[in-house]
């Protein structure tokens, strides 16, 4: 465990961060721990930025197509009525904390169902009252039809991709840190890799501007969904995972080998 007091992290040549599903609940402690490690992958400053989903707003400002999001902040002191007016008027939508891991605190609701809408208001209010920013996004219907795609980059290079079944079924509510994702395929799609390259370039551009230098990411998982026929974009970015996102290492023997090779390359850099 990253917060185990009996571990002397100074003795580690390189620390690779993977299973830290509780970091969001102890974010400040995790940030301090990461900064204390001499050689950590991914880099502490990069994980710091990625630990708050407001990064999506920053990437959107740089031209990435992100699902339109309403950001709710604790300091706004919003009433239940004000929350109601900020939710979509039709269709399904998603409410989740801006600082979370493994989908915890995520709920899917139906705009025109009074009971569901009321539950969404209570959900958002609970998060805000506990000092946690909230994001509200319309649920894209094409996710139910086509699922999601995860593109995995290792040491900055396109490595493999997986196609996943939708996780947020109607009335989905999450209070757990981990939810099993159903992978339907690991076939490669050249179009999605072209989109992924656009995302990778923008992410690295932001890292350069933020850190003052480029940082080669050991791992980078980009989650995308294809746009629908009436959407303004061909694809949308759901998330960029640089901390503890699943890399689907058990889905294909080559995935684990590629990740091990990537680590070995960095250790002997």
Predicted regions located by residue number:
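ATP-dependent carboxylate activation and anion-phosphoryl transfer catalytic cores
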Residues: 157, 172, 191-269
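Phosphate-binding site of ATP-dependent enzymes
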Residues: 111-209, 225-226, 235-236
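Short catalytic/ligand-binding loop motif for oxyanion handling, primarily in non-cytosolic enzymes
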Residues: 23-25, 102-105, 144-145, 160-162, ...
